């Protein structure tokens, strides 16, 4: 298995964590355990891993989409992409690896349980430390591909100043 998803019990049901949430949890856990080198994630993934790496004094690379690019990061300590592909032990497997990811996630969950907390509590701790960044995939289909270029040009020319009533603080 090359992928690993995680879900948490919430209000009598289960909520699947996003790839970005799981990536933040894994990156933070590995950094707290003394990881050295560089973290990496694809450009379509959250910027949160970069903040986590900076907080712990680690390097961070943003790569093109696809694990072949993440795996090329020099001194890779941890890499992920939002499509639930994680590389928590690049010295053992320098690719996305669901098996080693499940072992690391189980260890993190056990740590949370021992502290009478949860994975969601740990995420809140991460957000309190480095800032919250939430992502949500958006898919739309068009028949005329030039519409995508037009839409991106329009957003670049006049970036939004607010989203869902909240001010936009920075546009990259």
Which residue ranges define each predicted feature?
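Phosphate-binding and adjacent anionic-ligand microenvironments
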Residues: 1, 9, 15, 33-172
């Amino acid at each position: 298995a090359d992928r690993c998803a995680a879900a948490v019990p919430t209000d009598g049901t289960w909520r699947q964590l996003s790839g970005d949430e799981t990536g933040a949890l894994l990156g933070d856990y590995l950094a707290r355990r003394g990881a050295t080198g560089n973290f990496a994630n694809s450009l379509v993934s959250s910027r949160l891993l970069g903040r986590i790496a900076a907080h712990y004094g680690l390097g961070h690379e943003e790569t093109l989409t696809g694990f072949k690019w993440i795996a090329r990061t020099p001194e890779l300590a941890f890499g992920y992409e939002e499509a639930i592909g994680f590389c928590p032990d690049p010295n053992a497997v320098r690719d996305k690896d669901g098996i080693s990811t499940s072992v690391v996630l189980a260890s993190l969950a056990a740590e949370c349980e021992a502290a009478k907390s949860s994975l969601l509590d740990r995420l809140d701790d991460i957000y309190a430390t480095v800032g919250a960044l939430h992502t949500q995939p958006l898919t739309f289909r068009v028949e005329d591909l030039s519409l995508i270029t037009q839409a991106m040009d329009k957003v670049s020319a006049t970036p939004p100043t607010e989203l869902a009533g909240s001010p936009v603080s920075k546009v990259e």
